[in-house]
């Protein structure tokens, strides 16, 4: 959706126009940027398809807001944020709740090495999140906490200290999706 008008505030946020440190940008404000963009996408692009029984597979959704913005908070403030976020997006905005959430879990250090490799290959630009290693480590912990709290399925991208192959991770993802569709 980055080419749509509804993503303007997201682009500004990720470019650092509200501050270069993601932790200093209100998680409530940043979450609202993403929520409004999701709402616009739902209403304009996929609502009819979904309501007719279509299956949607989303790479990042409300759950990504829970991880990236919830990672800015701790303890009771984080729990209150999760409640607020889900109320905003699912109850007030009417976005569909996911039937299945798969969270790819990778140690922050390995993710950093993969980003550096991507940088040397000239693939993509880093956003303000990708420049903040401590923030990303906290996001990983938030994802693991949220997975337990909400019943998400964690998929480890590492086995015996080594990165799993894309094909191996794909097969595990496929199994979970197939099982969900059978229900």
What feature does the model see in each segment?
Residues 51-52, 96-97, 148:
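Short loop/turn elements that form and flank the Walker-type P-loop nucleotide-binding site
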Residues 13, 36, 60, 104-105, ...:
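Conserved catalytic core of Hanks-type protein kinase domains
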Residues 109-183:
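NTP-dependent small-molecule kinase module
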Residues 57, 100-102, 153-155:
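Hydrophobic/aromatic beta-strand patches that form the interior of the parallel beta-sheet core
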Residues 1-87, 91-93:
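ATP-dependent small-molecule kinase phosphotransfer cores
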Residues 63-141:
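A glycine- and Lys/Arg-enriched "phosphate-lid" helix/loop adjacent to the NTP-binding pocket
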